[in-house]
Amino acid sequence: MRVYHSNNFRSGCKIIFENEPYLIESSEFVKPGKGQAFVRVKLRKLLTRQLIEKTFKSTDYLEIADVIEHTLCYLYNDGFFWYFINNNTFEELSVEKKIIGIQKKWLLEQDTCIVTLWNNKPILVTPNTFVEIKVIETDATLKGDTINTGVTKLAILSTGAIVRVPLFIQVGSLIKVDTRSGEYVSR
């Protein structure tokens, strides 16, 4: 069993805490004037993306999580499973709908994404930070609407996602969206 000593906790380390995989977002070593030193850590649960804050003694240690990230190409879905392929080894991987979650609205066929495996089972799918998706439905704009008004309207994308876009965006436009926030970036 490989372990991380709490003094070696660094941002990006993946650990097992309470029998689940976590990602260390940040860690701070604290040496009070009186008493034992400790490490204050922000952890992100990889299964649910929940963020928690914990304090560990400087003598504590945690097991290293057997978490592997693969860059895979999204192929298709059948409503229950999403299928991905490794372009180097041509191995196919299926991921359940509940694991895909809300990320399904950012997955386009033939796009690459990161699939995180824990004990050789998929636990998380992370799409590219920016994706270009076609607008299939939006309100018509009136002549005279300009870019500088700061006013937005709703647009439905080909993946089913709903995004606020500027007034000049029309049906059929290809727009760039930030998948982390779900916001329009550019066209």
UniProtKB/Swiss-Prot annotation:
Subcellular localization: Cytoplasm
Database matches in Gene3D superfamilies: 2.30.30.30, Nucleic acid-binding proteins (2.40.50.140)
Main location: cytoplasm
GO cellular component entries: cytoplasm
PTMs per UniProt: May be beta-lysylated on the epsilon-amino group of Lys-34 by the combined action of EpmA and EpmB, and then hydroxylated on the C5 position of the same residue by EpmC (if this protein is present). Lysylation is critical for the stimulatory effect of EF-P on peptide-bond formation. The lysylation moiety may extend toward the peptidyltransferase center and stabilize the terminal 3-CCA end of the tRNA. Hydroxylation of the C5 position on Lys-34 may allow additional potential stabilizing hydrogen-bond interactions with the P-tRNA.
GO BP term, example: peptide biosynthetic process
Pathway linked to the protein: Protein biosynthesis; polypeptide chain elongation
Transmembrane segment boundaries: none
Modified residue annotations for N6-(3,6-diaminohexanoyl)-5-hydroxylysine: 34
Single annotated GO MF: translation elongation factor activity
Record keywords, A-Z: Cytoplasm, Elongation factor, Hydroxylation, Protein biosynthesis
Record's function text: Involved in peptide bond synthesis. Alleviates ribosome stalling that occurs when 3 or more consecutive Pro residues or the sequence PPG is present in a protein, possibly by augmenting the peptidyl transferase activity of the ribosome. Modification of Lys-34 is required for alleviation.
Family membership: Belongs to the elongation factor P family.
NCBIfam families the UniProt entry points to: efp, PRK00529.1
Protein's recorded name: Elongation factor P
Gene behind this protein: efp
